[in-house]
A protein has these predicted regions:
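Short, solvent-exposed loop/turn segments at secondary-structure boundaries
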Residues: 6-7, 136-139, 201-204
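A conserved beta-strand/loop capping segment in the N-terminal third of enzymes
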Residues: 1-41
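A short, flexible beta-alpha/helix-coil linker loop
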Residues: 2, 131-133, 195-198
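C-terminal helical "tail/cap" subdomain of flavin- and related membrane-associated enzymes
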Residues: 214-222
Length: 222
């Protein structure tokens, strides 16, 4: 079964996002590679002992494993290739589920698909994605499966520019209120994945992060 979607598809590379933020934000607002030691409703203490005072603190960290949540995992490896000649793929392939439907670990059945994004006439981004109950990522096997897929669709071997990988939680049930109460601090607002601001199926957070950032910048008393 094939279906062509007549809609726009937007994608943002980590490299471009990082570059734009560094160029746009004042240098004094950037704190890179810095770990937070502690925080409360009006301050954040960094690992090096520096204390940042603030009118408000928002916890936007990643989601954490909890006995209060139920679900599985979205597991993926993505690879960005450059080819010696144009690849000929004009539109994104959003979800090719014609690939084998199994997880690498234990050879269990799992919902798996490949997606392909044409980033330039001679560049493609491939991602091998599957949903599984086990939190296990075999990077080398997924890398190999992407190489196989390249051959299957008739492409010559390309040069890998970059690679990414991830294991994202897919929450299907549980007691979210109990989950939040297990770590939230009085007076500290919650956002990001830890606060549940993520898509229920993909676990992606970017659209929610943008909406929250605009709302905070536009209305908060900073």
């Amino acid at each position: 079964y094939k279906r062509k979607m007549h809609a726009n598809y937007c994608s943002l590379s980590s490299k471009d996002f990082d570059k734009t933020l560094r160029e746009t934000l004042p240098l004094e607002t950037q704190s890179l590679g810095t770990r937070v030691k502690n925080f409360d409703s009006s301050s954040v203490t960094l690992a090096d002992g520096e204390r940042l005072e603030a009118g408000a603190v928002i916890d936007c960290r990643n989601i954490i494993a909890s006995k209060h949540l139920e679900g599985g995992w979205q597991i993926f490896v993505g690879r960005h290739f450059k080819y010696k000649k144009p690849h000929g793929i004009k539109n994104p392939i959003i979800m090719d589920a014609s690939v084998t439907q199994h997880a690498p670990s234990g050879n269990r059945s799992a919902y798996r698909f490949m997606y392909v994004l044409p980033l330039a006439d001679d560049e493609l981004f491939f991602e091998d994605t599957y949903y599984d109950e086990e939190r296990a990522l075999d990077e080398n096997l997924l890398k190999y499966r992407i190489d196989q897929y390249n051959q299957q669709i008739g492409l010559e071997e390309g040069t890998e520019i970059s690679r990414e990988k991830g294991i994202l939680p897919v929450i299907t049930g549980g007691d979210f209120k109990a989950y939040l109460s297990s770590f939230e601090k009085q007076g500290v607002a919650m956002a990001g994945a830890r606060g549940g601001f993520n898509h229920p199926l993909t676990s992606f957070t970017m659209p929610f992060a943008v909406s929250n950032a605009l709302a905070i910048a536009g209305k908060a008393n900073l």
